[in-house]
Amino acid sequence: MEQATQSPAEADAAHHMAIKAAEEAGPPQDWTAALDHLQRSAHLGSRLAQAELAGLSGQWPLAHDILAGAAVQDSPWSRFRSSIDLAKWLHPPPVSNISEGPRIAVVKDLATTEACDWLIARARPRLKPAQIYDEKEGRHRSGDGRTNTVCPFPQPDRDLILAIVRARVASVTGMQVRAMESPHILHYSEGEEFAPHFDTTENPNSPGFRPRVLTFLISLNDDYEGGETEFPVIGGRWKGRKGGALFFWNVEPDGTLDRRTLHAGRPVTRGEKWMLSQWIGPPVEG
């Protein structure tokens, strides 16, 4: 049995190294190193790392208990680490193209049910009002057209389960993890919506200009009514099953805005809707 130790600073540093190794943030992507760092972080007392190891090894009830603050009496981190089937986690699912103009595709099982529940659990206590970007004012602000809440995940707040989901996004799109912005978990209560909008702008001189080549949306639950993602220009709507995904290119092949990608999150009429949103930019060199 491993002897657990407590060193918060070292535990946080090891967890940070795990995420860096998984996300190509500096050194080349190295999943073995990522899991090694995660195990060390768990051994040093990181509850988040402990919960991640439990979940990745299939011990999901324990993972949620740890995430909620439960203590683990022994130290099974090495055993959990050795039982993780990384190849299964990273195996990319098939993609189905549903539109060539604009370019839209769907994925049936991008995230497991358990990963969806994990992401919701991590986001729920950290939700805040969503904002829109005002191109004229060059800043983010609250807007009448967007009434939902959101939880951003900058790198210090990410975990290896989220990193694996993003790696699967990279696999099915052919895009780089390094080109991805920080992901956001979106939450819609009854009546909340996001009015028709574009995810990128035509004006490269805008103060907040970000060339978002592709938008990737993952349904984290499906036990609600309404809330479809709607494309009013082409007359299409999508509501994915739990773990399913939709992605579309915001730009034409020449890089200009594809105005057919105007889309909206329709109001939820019953229950609550959870979704992961991932914007991806152009390839990053180096």
List each language-model region with its residue ranges.
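Fe(II)/2-oxoglutarate oxygenase catalytic core
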Residues: 1-5, 19, 36-246, 251-286
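Short coil/turn and helix-start
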Residues: 25-29, 43
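Structural signature of tandem alpha-helical TPR/SEL1-like repeats
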Residues: 28-36
